[in-house]
Amino acid sequence: MTPHINAKIGDFYPQCLLCGDPLRVSYIAKKFLQDAKEITNVRNMLGFSGKYKGKGISLMGHGMGIASCTIYVTELIKTYQVKELLRIGTCGAISPKVGLKDIIMAMGASTDSKTNRVRFLNHDLSATPDFELSLRAYQTAKRLGIDLKVGNVFSSDFFYSFETHAFDLMAQYNHLAIEMEAAGLYATAMELSAKALCLCSVSDHLITKEALSPKERVESFDNMIILALEMMS
């Protein structure tokens, strides 16, 4: 047990899917897993363990932003011995290379947060995912006929950004979208010798102002859930 997770040791499988929204975690458990069991609920941040096609897998919410995400990731790795962490979330596109419903694999994560500079003695940290997880995601997407978009993301501390003038510059540097956690997830996994990857479904386009309806968000997210579960099975 940790200050933020009240699961017992052994409740988590070595592979864990992460979502910012705990209700989305519950949705995945009920719709996609067999024998799903709630294993933690501190602060209503839900976690489940169950099976997908006979293989054990866990789910955990992590809240919004790098600070919240890294708390849960640290405790999952250090206390519960989780080895592979796959974040599946939504993002806002900033590049003409991607559109609504596209799934992005974050091959690098820039950030306006100072957390990685603090942990890396004020140097620039290259926040990147695990290669083997990335390869599995790419190969699984090919098998499922999913056109996975690969590029960088920008992990912002601000949901309501005041640096919209920087979107064109980010796109020039092959940043496909903005989200809020990948840079912290990758850095924490690197520090603690775990494997991590972030997949994001485009729910909004910050340049064209297009946005999915609530129904479309669920449908597009389901495709990413299936990709995530298939690559972990």
UniProtKB/Swiss-Prot annotation:
Marked site (Important for catalytic activity) residue numbers: R217
Known EC number: 2.4.2.1
Chain positions recorded as phosphate binding sites: G20, R24, R43, R87, I88, G89, T90
CDD domains: PNP_EcPNPI-like
Main EC class the enzyme belongs to: transferase
Active-site residues annotated for this sequence: D204
Record key words, sorted: Glycosyltransferase, Transferase
One of the Pfam families matching this protein, by short name: PNP_UDP_1
Family: Belongs to the PNP/UDP phosphorylase family.
Main function: Catalyzes the reversible phosphorolytic breakdown of the N-glycosidic bond in the beta-(deoxy)ribonucleoside molecules, with the formation of the corresponding free purine bases and pentose-1-phosphate.
Protein name: Purine nucleoside phosphorylase DeoD-type
